[in-house]
């Protein structure tokens, strides 16, 4: 019997090897996390088939490690799964032989290498005067007054997918709560970036949607780094939370982080948007691939003179420009800081999106089009094939 089981196992391997490998992302090795992969299943796979596949993948992983008579430190096999409408998959750490077999499995659509995710922000100085709020509420530059409707994002929940948020900061006035942590065991913002972006989209002083609720979703550590798989896990938590709490159609998400061109990330972002959450995404700085997922609102950055910043990414995927240079906002421990980057432009877009959802009652799938409709054509120094539209909240000023 042992002989026949071994023969059957070899036959399965031979069958798998007859199917072309579907491992993608190897053409660019920058920021790749060694031996870490994201497996995406065919869209037609059932829940039962998905469970069966996971058991098979785990068995293959254990067998291959056993044949090498070694544990290969860090190769833990299957770690986390994700499930969105029409999209199932998992992430894990596997040796090359195992991931090759997984990639050739008929139930697998493709396998993508996992990558390091980084922040885009550039710290400049503390406690400098802010200009972004005045700019987005006036059709012309020059005013420091923020003009807005008193609804101010009331009834909308914003997920800050970032380094965490100092939820006790006075800027949030009890409207901020902790959600989840997919990167470490420190349920606080040890970096400051997440608190800063949250202060822009929903802070009482520096924010746009001043009455929105805020939920901290930590996917990046104190150094501002994480992984594609960890970000996916965080987005999964947001969609599940929105579904359980009746927030779909009344929720927004800010993603001020840099992910190099990722097919699976784009699909996850699209799935989150289609589930009923408005997504604002940073275009990226200095060569980072812009978020090109359909339906998300991608933000590039301008300075106080309405000029596109030299470090902001560009291209046809940019939906709108937003203030991104020398932006003052909340910082951990009741502090403030001034940061620059498309990371700062994205929360302006997110805040205006939440503001419009509350004010006009529009759904998440209509928000980005409405933002582009309201925006003013005032950006200068923009690059080829990039919009001139600058974020505007429609105040009438």
UniProtKB/Swiss-Prot annotation:
Its EC number is 3.4.21.-. Secreted subtilisin-like serine protease with keratinolytic activity that contributes to pathogenicity. Gene3D superfamilies: Peptidase S8 propeptide/proteinase inhibitor I9, Peptidase S8/S53 domain. Residues 36-119 form the Inhibitor I9 domain. Pfam families: Inhibitor_I9, Peptidase_S8. GO terms for molecular function: serine-type endopeptidase activity. CDD domains: Peptidases_S8_PCSK9_ProteinaseK_like (cd04077). This is Subtilisin-like protease 9. PANTHER family: ALKALINE PROTEASE 1-RELATED (PTHR43806:SF58), PEPTIDASE S8 (PTHR43806). Belongs to the peptidase S8 family. The keyword Flavoprotein does not apply. One of its GO terms (cellular component) is extracellular region. The active site is at 162 (charge relay system), 193 (charge relay system), 343 (charge relay system). Residues 130-397 form the Peptidase S8 domain. It comes from Trichophyton verrucosum (strain HKI 0517). It comes from the Eukaryota.
